[in-house]
Amino acid sequence: ETWWDTDEGISFLREREVNPEFDKEADRRLLQKIKQGNVIVTSYTAPWISKVGFKVWLDGSLEKRTERMAKRDNISLEECRAKIIVRDKENYELYKRHYGIEFGTDKKPFDMVINTDNLTARQVADAILEKMKETGIW
């Protein structure tokens, strides 16, 4: 089970829903790190709020995401599927309300979108590096 799915993680998400300044402060700090350069960042908001960087969206079907989460967390497919559906809905609503972002559907800010369903982590990394080399970023 990942931290986000624990009681503490869920409580943290609830705080974010009612206190947008919490996320905005995290974003300010994240942008400072991005501006320093030479970093790899995983962020839901950075592709929309940062003008710099090579931005990648990792896409996956609900079925494959469910399988991967069930294997990683050793819980049932049904429980994983329900958690993913709730998390996706809550993320969409949160980022729409706080940022006007259509999270999960608007992929315009991304330099690359990869469907990871039939790829290993190594294949995903290799595809990203290849694209970065093609574009002259690497």
How does the language model describe each region?
Residues L77-A127:
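Small-molecule kinase domains that catalyze NTP-dependent phosphoryl transfer to phosphate-bearing small molecules
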Residues V52-R87:
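Conserved phosphate-donor/acceptor-positioning beta-strand/loop module used by diverse small-molecule
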Residues D27-K35, T66, Y92-F103, E134:
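Active-site cofactor/cluster-binding pocket
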Residues E1-S50, I75:
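ATP-dependent small-molecule kinase phosphotransfer cores
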Residues Y44-P47, S61, L119:
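Short glycine-rich anion-binding loops that position phosphate/pyrophosphate groups of nucleotides
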Residues A46-G53, T105-K108:
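Short loop/helix-cap segments at secondary-structure boundaries that form the rim of catalytic
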